[in-house]
Every structure is written in C-alpha cells, then in structure tokens.
Amino acid sequence: MRKTRVEKARQAFLNGDLETHRNLHSPEEIGKEPWHKAEQGKYIGQAVYGASDGIVTTFAAISGVAGANLSPTVALIVGLANLFADGLSMAIGDYLSEKSEKDYIKAEREREFWEVEHFPEAEKLEIKEIYKRKGLRGEKLDALVDAITSSKDLWVETMLHEELGLFEDDTSPLKSALVTFFSFVIAGFMPLVTYVFASTWTFVAEHRFALSCVITAVTMFIVGAVRQAVTGVKWYKGGMEMLFVGGMSAAVAYFIGWLLRTIFGIVM
C-alpha cells in the first residue's frame, strides 16, 4: 500500500529527517494530498486492535487450560468457544458504540442548525467567544467570525468541533464491526492451529502447547509491529510491547489454571 504524505511525514519525524519533512511540506506535495482517507485505510485501527485482542484472549484461554493440565480436547473447545463468543461480543460492542456516537452527533448537529436558525446573534457571539479564548482580538477576530458565520454548514461544524468537541468520520459501523470480528477470529485462531491439526502429525500432537507458544509469539510480534501504522511507534517497539502484554496475560492464566488444579485436584 502506498504511503500517504502524512505517513511519510510521520516516519520522517521519527527518523529525525528534516530534509524529507521539508520536502513533504512543499506547496506541490500539500496540493497532491487527498483529504479523505482511502476506503481500505479507514478500518486499519479496528483490524489491528481486533487482532490484538483476539490473539491475547484466545492464547490466555488455552494457557489456563494447559496450566490446569486438562485434555487437549478441552483446550480446543474452550479456545474455539472463546474465540467466536468474544469476537462476536467485541464486534457487536464496536457496532453499537460507533452507531450511538453517530446518532448522538447527528442529533447535536440538528440542534445546532435549529439554534443558528432561531438565535443567530447568540450563536455568533459563541463563535466569537471561542476564538477570543484562543487569543484572537480586534479586526482579525471579527473577520474570522464573519467568514465562519457566512456559511451555515461551516458555522454548525465549527460549533460541533470547537464548542462540543465532536468529530465525525465517514466509517460505517457495520463495516467496522465486520473488520473487528474477522481480524479477531483470524488472529485469535493462531494459538489453536496446533490443536486443530494435532491428529495430522505426531510431533505436533506431542508438543502442541509448546508449538502454540511459538506460533503465538511470532504472530503477537507481527501484530504489535503492524500497530505502528496506527500509533506511529517504532515497529520493533510495538512488537515487543505486544509480546510482553500477551505473554503476561498467558502467564497469569497458566498460573491460575495450575493453582486451581493444585487446590482442587482437577483431572480431565
């Protein structure tokens, strides 16, 4: 995927590359910048965080089963149940959250249009106060207020952003939920690969949890490294952070499983 000007500028900043940064801020480069996200770039955040949650929660689940020394069949059942139930729950939560936010912004936009229509002077004064607090005074302030209030659409959007702190993107709640679900399931399936295909190879069957740890660690690092597309952190730092968080979660789950087996003598 071709990097945008903003992504190149972010990388130049991280590398301390002043010359590249200067070139990216030339009038020609700024003029070529598309001011709307490409369709495939809108849902990167959901995909990355869905994958992160999927692999961590699933691996923690089977680690708990391994710590309790339960059968591989139990691990597979628990892992798959956790994978699809948590994935669906997360996707539904994502959908409801985004839809609620969009509905709220829509209602606030309608209210602001109504106020601009019925109380224009009061709303104009609010715009003036907003920018006065930002340090503008005199003719510059008056000119800016006149420019903003000359368009009702711009006027209302400014009130939404500056007064209410509301910003709306053009992502689809349904698409966002689907991206979250499938990224969760795909990444979350990786810790279960050795359990699913254990019957095919004897070596895999004998070392399924150890091999699952290796596969999961590699996948966690990759998912963490990809996070830099969203957070801007160094790829190796993102990978190590993800590996640490996932490892700690799995270690705690394994310990709890072992502790319960020791206390209650669970055997399955």
Regions found by a protein language model. Give the residues of each.
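Cytosol/matrix-facing amphipathic helices and coiled-coil assembly/linker segments
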Residues: 2, 9-45, 98-180
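Transmembrane alpha-helical segments and their cytosolic interface motifs
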Residues: 40-62, 167-193
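Juxtamembrane transmembrane-helix termini in multi-pass membrane transport proteins
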Residues: 48, 52, 56-81, 91-93
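Hydrophobic alpha-helical membrane-embedded segments
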Residues: 81-105
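Alpha-helical transmembrane segments of multipass membrane proteins
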Residues: 85, 89, 187, 191, ...
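Structural signature of hydrophobic alpha-helical transmembrane segments
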Residues: 206-218
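Interfacial loop-to-transmembrane junctions
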Residues: 224-247
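Juxtamembrane boundary at the C-terminal end of a transmembrane helix
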Residues: 255-268
